[in-house]
Amino acid sequence: MASLIYRQLLTNSYTVELSDEIQEIGSTKTQDVTVNPGPFAQTNYAPVNWGPGETNDSTTVEPVLDGPYQPTTFNPPVSYWMLLAPTNAGVVVEGTNNTNRWLATILIEPNVQQVERTYTLFGQQVQVTVSNDSQTKWKFVDLSKQTQDGNYSQHGSLLSTPKLYGVMKHGGKIYTYNGETPNATTGYYSTTNFDTVNMTAYCDFYIIPLAQEAKCTEYINNGLPPIQNTRNIVPVSIVSRNIVYTRAQPNQDIVVSKTSLWKEMQYNRDIVIRFKFANSIIKSGGLGYKWSEVSFKPANYQYTYTRDGEEVTAHTTCSVNGINDFNYNGGSLPTDFVISKYEVIKENSFVYIDYWDDSQAFRNMVNVRSLAADLNSVMCTGGDYSFALPVGNYPVMTGGAVSLHSAGVTLSTQFTDFVSLNSLRFRFRLSVEEPPFSILRTRVSGLYGLPAARPNNSQEYYEIAGRFSLISLVPSNDDYQTPIINSVTVRQDLERQLGELRDEFNNLSQQIAMSQLIDLALLPLDMFSMFSGIKSTIDAAKSMATNVMKRFKKSSLANSVSTLTNSLSDAASSISRSASVRSVSSTASAWTEVSNITSDINVTTSSISTQTSTISRRLRLKEMATQTDGMNFDDISAAVLKTKIDKSTQLNTNTLPEIVTEASEKFIPNRAYRVKDDEVLEASTDGKYFAYKVETFEEIPFDVQKFADLVTDSPVISAIIDFKTLKNLNDNYGISRQQALNLLRSDPRVLREFINQDNPIIRNRIESLIMQCRL
C-alpha cells in the first residue's frame, strides 16, 4: 500500500500529453513514401502524404486541393482547374488571349428580377441585363465576345448552392461548369493560343490537377470540406508556388514564403538520436525477500555530436507506453522470493523519444507544418540483474531483446530537472527479437520482450541516425524570437526524497521483529512507522507532540467554532473565529484534538509498539486517492504534510509542529469568508462583497457600515461551502434553516451526511477545493 501511495504522489508531479499518440497507435499502417514538394502551396489541408523528408530523386506528390490563393492576375498552368470561391455578387474571373476570345464570369445573387447592371470587364464599363429566378441558388453566367469592340453574349449559366465555379485551360479549349448543382457538368469554349490566356481572379481560388477532376466536380456540386471553411485557413500569394529546391545538405534553412512580418522557414536536419532507458526497482518492506515492482521510468540524456562541422548539443527523453505487467510469486512465506510486478515491453508497446537540440530549427518551434522524418532501426537487448536476497542464491533476471522501428513524428514538450523544451517526439513500434528473457533459479523462462530490470544492458546509450524536415512560421526579422509555448521550471526532487524515505523505511523494517512488521503493514502511512522499532526515537516523538500542542496554543485555532469528527479530522473543517478583520487570512485545522495528544502518551508504557500506536491514533495520515472517482474527502491536507515530510531528509523536534501549523493555515489557497448575523455577508476572493438572507438566499443591498460592525463584534467564518453552492443546493434539493446554518459554519457532521448521500453539489464543491490543493 505504501508503494501505491508513493506512486500516487509521484503521479501528481508530472504532466504528460499522450492523447494524440494514444489515438494514433495502431490506427494506421506506416509506409515510407518519398516526397519532394512540387510547385504548389501546402496550406493546412488534409490529407497529406507524409514521407521521410527531402531525398535525392524526382518523385513529386501533389495535393488534391492546392490553396487557397489570394486574388491575382497570372497565367494558370495548362490542365489545372481554377476552383473559384467568391463571397459576393459581381465579376468572378476574366481571361483573354487578346486575339479572338474575351471571356468573363459574373455571379448573380438569388431572386433577382430582370435588371440592367453595370460591370467593369477588361477595364471597360459594360451594361448587362441579368436575372436569377431561383429563390435559393446563386447564378454564374459566362459573358463572351470574339472581338475587342464586340458585344458580350451570355452562355452556359450555372445555378449553384455552394457558390463555387471552375475554369481550366486544356486541349485548345477553355473549360467551365454549367447546369445546376448538385448535377453540374463541364462545358468548353474553343480558342487559339489557349496556353497564353492570362486569368484575373477577383476572389480566393484553389488549383486542382486535371487528374482530380472528379474531386473538383464533387466540390462544385457539394461544397468544400469543412476544414476549408474555418478562420484558420488563410489565403497565400500565388508566388508561394515558385519554390526553388536544392540538393539536400546536413543543415538546410530554406525560405518558403515571406511577408512583411512573418516568413515560413523549412528546416532540414540530419540528426543523431542517443537515448537510454531508466528503471525503478522497489524493494518491499519486510525481511528482504520481496520486491514490489520493477518498472520503466522516463530517462533524460544530454550529449553532443558533430553535424556538418558544427558541434550540436542535444537532449533526449525516452519513455514507453503499452507496458505489459508480469509477476512472480515464489510462495506465501516471508522468506519466499516475490516480485509483485515487473514490466516488459513487447510488440504491442511503443517507445517515445523526445529530441531537442540547440540549432535554429528548435528556437521558434511554435507554428509548424509539413513535419516528416526518416530514421533507422535499432535493437535493444537486456542485461543481467541479480535480486540480492539476505540468504541463499540470488535469482537473476537475464536476456530479452526488442527492435525499434520508426512509426511517426509529432511535436512534444520534454521536461528536464530545470526547464521544459519544445521538441520533436519520435514514435517507435517494437518487434521482439532473440534471445528471450528468464529469471534464473525460478520457473520463469522463454518469455519474449525487454524487461525493465536492466534494459540498457551494459551500454551507456542506444543510437539512431536519421533526418527530419519541417516548415516553421517565424518572424521575418531574425533578431526577433517567439516565446516557447511551455516555459516552466520542472522539479523532480520529490521523487528522490521519496526514494530516500522508502529506503529508510525498508532498512528499518528488516531490523525489527516479525510482530512489529505486521504492525507496520497495518500502518503503512503512519509517520511514526518509520522509526517505531527504535526505542530512542519515542522520546523525540513525544517531544514533537508536545511542541505541536504548544504551537497550536499560540495560533488562532484556540477559538475553534465547531468540533471535528473522526471522519473529517484531516479535512478543512475546524472553522476559526476572530475579533478582527485580520482573521480573514484564516484558519482551519488539519488535525484533531491536538491539545489532547500529550495526555494520551503514557510515559510508563512498557511496550514500544504500544507507545507508537498510542501516538499514531492521534497523528495518522490517511490514504489520499488521486482519482476523483470514489475520492476520499477525509484528508485534504495529507498530501501537503506528506510532501513536507518527504522533502525533509531529517526530522527534528521543530519540524513537525511547523509543518502542522503551515498545513492548517494554508491548505486551501482560495477561500470565501462570511460574517453571520440576521443577514449573511460574504467577501469573495476578488474583494467583492455580497449580502444574503439565510431563509431565502436572496441577495439584499450590502451595508458597508453594518459589515464593519459585524466584523468587529461577531465571528468571521471561513467558508468551505460558499453561498453560490448553498443557493444551488436549496434550489435543487431544498434545505432547512438549521441545515443552512450548519453548512454556513461548515459543520463537519452535516458535511459528512451530504457526502454520504452522494450529493453532487456538495461533492463537486469539495472536489474543487481538493483540486486547488493538488501537488
Swiss-Prot record:
Site feature: Cleavage: R231, N232, R241, N242, R247, A248
Keywords of the record: Capsid protein, Coiled coil, Disulfide bond, Hemagglutinin, Host cell membrane, Host cytoplasm, Host cytoskeleton, Host endoplasmic reticulum, Host membrane, Host-virus interaction, Membrane, Outer capsid protein, Viral attachment to host cell, Viral penetration into host cytoplasm, Viral penetration via permeabilization of host membrane, Virion, Virus entry into host cell
Highest taxon above the source species: Viruses
Disulphides: C203-C216, C318-C380
Motif KID motif boundaries: 644-646
A cellular component annotation (GO) from this entry: host cell plasma membrane
InterPro entries xrefs: ConA-like_dom_sf (IPR013320), Rota_A_VP4 (IPR042546), Rota_VP4_MID (IPR035330), Rota_VP4_MID_sf (IPR038017), VP4_concanavalin-like (IPR000416), VP4_helical (IPR035329)
Keyword Isomerase: no
Keyword Oxidoreductase listed: no
Record protein name field: Outer capsid protein VP4
Residue numbers marked as site, Binding to sialic acid: R101, S190
Record region (Spike head): 65-224
